[in-house]
Amino acid sequence: MADKNSQAPVLIAGGGIGGLVVALTLHQVGVPCIVFEAVAELQPLGVGINLQPNAVRELHELGFDDALLDTVGIQAREWALVGRNGNDVYSEPRGRLAGYRWPQYSVHRGLLQMLLLQTVRERLGPDAVRLGRRVIGYRQNDGGVTALIERRDGSTEQVDGRLLIAADGLHSAIRAQMHPQQPPIQWGGAIMWRGTTPGVPIRSGASFVGVGSLRHRVVLYPISPPDPATGLATINWIAEIT
């Protein structure tokens, strides 16, 4: 049983950024794995997110150098808090400019996910990410774990693995089964509107700018370099009420 289990793949529930990075990391250390994703087609959805230097370090270790990450975002240079009168309250450098060995990146979440998906398929094979398959539960056994999987047509299958990793998001079915007494998700009271629009980047050209009050604020930052033809970048914006 031990020999059989040592050859079984690690099963990953969820093909988001976390699940795909786990798959690449396991492959890098020689551990076979399979990713199961509920949607029938992964698309570049979402808006801007930030990768702090320690996260970029892990991507560098996986072979995503600055040149590759530059295809999905830009290196952040500054954070600035600005008063409603337009004067600076506080500002500081970010990434390498702040003394880190790695940059901080502002990226489009969907473009990063597509880059990770492409890389997983190139390194692990086209069947490494199985779409249209939602992990709805699991059964522990002496040799590892059996994942219970629901297909898009309503049929089910069972897949054996040595380990099951729950990367299936906020409403994780695996977490719900593992911790049935867990209380429901609690809303913290904040409301956020998020989006992207074309615009001219301000200050350093790669700055986070926050303006507003304790309860109402807007944050703006570019997630692409300016288009040479228009001078416009993709600007991520967040309007928040707390």
What do the predicted segments below correspond to?
Residues V10-I12, C33:
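Conserved hydrophobic helix-helix packing surfaces used for dimerization/oligomerization
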